[in-house]
């Protein structure tokens, strides 16, 4: 957090302010304004200490030491909040713009998401990436928006440390494959992940919750990986949740060093 400073807080919140915050629950409004909402004292404190630009902070309790802070009543916070249970601090933040550098594929391990739809899954995957030191995630344009309020909350602050890129995923994978970048994908059939030879760099592609990796992207996967059940002959669940599969996959890659 920046050094504590004294600010005079005047209740100036307007109907237009509340309307703007509420509108940011919708992806179209986030795209048009370039803004997203973050709620909760811990998350907002992390944002204040990050490189992200804060547009406005609203608080009901102890004032937040930031020039953009404004004190509001609990009733006003309830009207603004996008959560079922409002917190005492809400920030409107500028969406960061990142440039995707294709050279990272030969230098780092990168996650790729193929039309993953559930906000909870996206949030968990971003948090996992942060835990396992994966700094970049590339997403198909149909993947759920990482600045959806539910995703932002689910990341527990990891959204500040992981760069999420929305792009033409098929074209990106095609270029990576042409450059001989290892492209791993998780499938119901393939090499046993626990015995497969894994590299320290490349792309790990995770598929949609219902259909898995799409055919248009599967053609560029050079290494198909399979997470086996236990015992191997067991017949039970058809597949793993994509966030759980991501956790297992990232853990195994990092375990190898």
Where in this protein do the model-derived segments appear?
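Short beta->alpha connector loops at strand-helix junctions that form conserved
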Residues: 72-74, 114, 140-141, 163, ...
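Amphipathic alpha-helical repeat scaffolds
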Residues: 40, 117-125, 237-245
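Boundary-proximal intrinsically disordered activation/regulatory segments immediately upstream
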Residues: 2-61, 143-144
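Structured adenosyl-cofactor binding patch, chiefly the S-adenosyl-L-methionine
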Residues: 131, 146-157, 219-257
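Active-site/ligand-binding-proximal alpha/beta "capping" segment
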Residues: 185-237
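RNA substrate-binding interface of SAM-dependent RNA methyltransferases
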Residues: 8, 49, 98-189
């Amino acid at each position: 957090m920046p050094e504590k400073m004294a600010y005079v807080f005047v209740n100036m919140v307007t109907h237009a302010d509340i309307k703007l915050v509420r509108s940011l629950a919708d992806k179209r409004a986030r795209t048009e304004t370039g803004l997203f909402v973050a709620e909760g004292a811990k998350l907002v404190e992390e944002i204040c200490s990050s490189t992200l630009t804060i547009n406005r902070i609203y608080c009901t309790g102890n004032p937040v030491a930031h020039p953009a802070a404004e004190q509001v009543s609990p009733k006003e916070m309830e009207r603004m909040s996008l959560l079922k249970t409002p917190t005492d601090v809400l920030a409107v933040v500028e969406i960061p713009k990142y440039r995707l550098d294709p050279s990272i594929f030969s230098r780092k391990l990168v996650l790729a998401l193929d039309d993953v739809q559930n906000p909870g899954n996206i949030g968990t995957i971003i948090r996992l990436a942060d835990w396992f030191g994966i700094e970049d995630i590339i997403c198909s344009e149909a993947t759920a928006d990482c600045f959806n309020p539910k995703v932002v909350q689910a990341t527990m602050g990891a959204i500040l440390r992981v760069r999420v890129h929305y792009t033409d995923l098929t074209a990106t994978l095609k270029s990576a494959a042409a450059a001989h970048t290892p492209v791993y994908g998780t499938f119901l059939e393939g090499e046993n992940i626990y015995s497969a030879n894994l590299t320290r760099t490349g792309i790990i592609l995770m598929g949609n919750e219902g259909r898995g990796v799409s055919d248009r992207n599967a053609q560029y996967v050079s290494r198909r990986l399979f997470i086996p059940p236990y015992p191997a002959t067991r017949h039970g669940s058809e597949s793993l949740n994509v966030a759980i599969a991501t956790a297992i996959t990232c853990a195994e890659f990092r375990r190898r060093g």
